[in-house]
Each structure stands twice: as structure tokens, then as C-alpha cells.
Amino acid sequence: AVTEPKIAEAVTREETPAKVDIPGDEDPNSGQEPDETITASSASASVDSSGSGSEISSSTVDSSTSESSVSESTVSESTEENGAAGGTESSTSEEPEEGSEVFGVDGETDAEEKDSSLKNYEALYQDMLEVTEKPKRALVTVIGITNQMDYFNQNYENQQQISGLIVADNGQDLFILTEYRIVENVERIQVTFWDETMVDATYQRHDPSTGLTIVKVDESKLDEETRDGLAVAPLGSSYLVSQGDPVVAVGSPVGYSNSIAYGVVTSVTNKISALDNEYNLLTTDILGSTDGSGILVNLDGEIVGIIAQSYSAKGNNVVTGIAISQIKKLIENLSNNVSRAYIGIRGQDVTEELSDKTGIPKGVLISRVADDSPAMMAGMKEYDVIVKLGEHKVETIKQYHEQLGKYSTGDVVTVTAMRKGAEGYAEMTFDVTMGEV
């Protein structure tokens, strides 16, 4: 039987909306403090969606086996008469008595040992399942609806759906992170919650570099039971994730809603290049779907990655996620409908080692200049090496992005770059008027 969706009745709420605040993380490898987060004004309460506002209940995974008491087999000694005259021989029985058990080295029977191992294995997965309880309450299904006409000129609704994540609650709206491709050019957006309550949502803002977007739901459309059962996502630190760490993929990692899969992180060093930035990817050994979506959860019940299969290597359907720490500021800006300053280049780091080998100056090597971007308008070209933004020296794309975040749309910044000519590299400056994303 098909379960009919529960359509929510409006419940009036009078809370004053507050600004969304997503606290950043410190990258232990950078030696730099995280960017300051945008905080609410004194008249509005700050909303913390990192999970620090409420203690995250986590279950420790214990895969150790309990000590078993060692049973000892009684060795019976029997003395029998020897056929030889006047002689006796003491013999030790090496065969177990009929009906007795044969014990292994550790004192357990083979059957008991196998049963114990299986129970420990089962308990391990049960513990891993339990740590996903709070993250699962933050998951929703986002549906993009368009009206189309069939061959017989009959109207019908075409629906596409994907996982969404509640990243903030300002007392008036729930802010849901999802992929823009599902809501682009649709006529209606709906969100389904944990109890099958279905409500309309509105588009807030999207980021073209990552393909992520925020949609929001008016909380007055949800009844008290639905609100009590949901949670704001506990966002962890992806900077603490290492190769080999266990993770649980939750949502629709294999293309089916409300599914989970277990695995380990196989790589934390892969990156994706985006306009004016780059993001780390968390690659796992979990086989997923090209249409998979959802989250990656660590054993503390914290979300460390957003599944984005569009970034999975071609021909390789393993579950891949964008590291959460690097997009927290982006999530905050999208939730607050704040534009980000834009120059329009893709770049890569020129490390000291690479500089020594190639003679390219240290800095950010431009691999692409976006068409009609502020960078192109200012005269910047591919293979220029950016060394300063304003008065601040930049040697990595991360430093470049951090400095870029200090500017607003319309600001004019002087970009210093090195350009190769007939006599080697020469310094050039470009006055760039910041665009808007």
C-alpha cells in the first residue's frame, strides 16, 4: 500500500528571525585561525548549527571481544593390570569421554568462538547505526516539480528528488542545503520530512562553483510533532578526518531514499577546482550511485562531508563527498542570502618544490580565466601567477580565497601577478572591480 503524504497544517509562530551563523573550523595543517563567522546583531539571537548548542550523543564503537573463561578438560588417569608378572603400568587417557566437547586453544569450542565473533561484528554495526540517529533527523527529501505535457496534450507533473540537510534554524525558517540541479528552473519546490509531512519550500540562493543551494521552509507550516522530531545537522570538522577512518553514508548514497552504507575514507587529498577557490574531497570505498546524495557521518555522529557524486572520478561510482569544513562559510552566506565577491579565475598552488623545478614564481597559477569575468575585463590571462591581493601576499589558493572574502561586490582591488615574457617573469598589476556570485 502506498502511504499518502501528510500535508502539514499551518501553526502560527511569532519568533523574530535571527541571522544564520555557521562557526568555522581550524585547519591544523595551515597554522592559521579559521575565518571569523558572521554573527547575529545584538537584537537577534545567534543560531549555531554546528551542534555545539546541544550535546551530541555518540556511541563508542567497541570491537573488542570479552574475555572468555577457560574451561579445563579433566584428564582421567586409569591404572590397569599389566599382563607381565608382577608389573603395573599407569596409562593417561588422551581421548575425551563420550559426549564431552573438544575445546580450542582459548578454551572455547569452535562453535562458541564463531558465535561470539559474529555477535561482536553485529554489535559493531549496530553501534555505527546508532551514531547516525541525530544526523538522520536532519535529513529531508527535496523535490523539484515541473509541469509538462505528454503526447496526448495532457498535463502532468514531472518530479525529481534528492536528499537535503537542515543546516540552520533561525526561529522562523528552516534552511536546507541541497543540490541546485534539482531545483533549477522548477515551478515548485517541496520538502518531505521524517514523518512524511510534505510542505512547499522557497529558493534562497545558490553557488555556481559547487552546485550547492539553500532552500527554506516556513516553520509555521509544520505542526509541533514534526518540529519536535527533526534536528539541525551536527556539523563536524573534516580537517580531523584521516585516510582509513570509518564513515557511514546516510541519505540516498546508492540511489534509494532512507538508505545507509558503511565504509572507510580512502583519500582526503583529492581536490576540485572552483572559481576563486578549491575544495577537498573525501573519497570512500562505498559503492554508490551516480545519482547518490546524502551525507558522510563519522563515529561521533558528526557530519564531515556532503555527498556529491558529480565529483566522483569518471567510471568510478564510489561515494565521494565535499569536505564540510571548507564550505561552512559558503553555507552561512547562502543561508543569509549574502553574495560573495568574485574575480573569476581557477588556479592552483605553485609550491616551493614546484617553483624550484620549473622556475615559476610561488603563488597562485591561473589555469583558467572565466569568460566575461572581472579578471578577464581587467586583462588577466592564463598562466599569470597571482602573488598579492591588495596589500596581502598570497602563496596558495586557500590564502587567495581568504583574502577575497574580505571584499564586497563593487570593491576595486589591486591584484599583483607575475607574467612570463621574453626575458622571464615580470610583475604586473591589475585593478579588478569585484563581481557578484
Task: Annotate each predicted stretch with a short phrase.
Residues 1-151, 158, 175, 223, ...:
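N-terminal targeting leaders that route proteins to membranes or the secretory/organellar pathways
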Residues 5, 169-213, 217-220, 229:
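Catalytic-histidine neighborhood of serine endopeptidases
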Residues 97, 115-116, 127, 299, ...:
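C-terminal cap/linker of serine protease catalytic domains
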Residues 117, 216-237, 243, 424-437:
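C-terminal, low-ordered peptide segments at domain boundaries
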Residues 120-130, 146-175, 198-200, 232-234, ...:
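A conserved glycine-rich beta-strand in the N-terminal activation segment of trypsin-fold
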Residues 149, 157-158, 186-188, 222-230, ...:
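Active-site loop architecture of trypsin-fold serine endopeptidases
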Residues 156, 161, 333-403, 411-437:
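PDZ/PDZ-like groove recognition
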Residues 234-257:
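Short glycine/Trp-rich loop-beta-loop segment that forms part of the substrate-binding cleft
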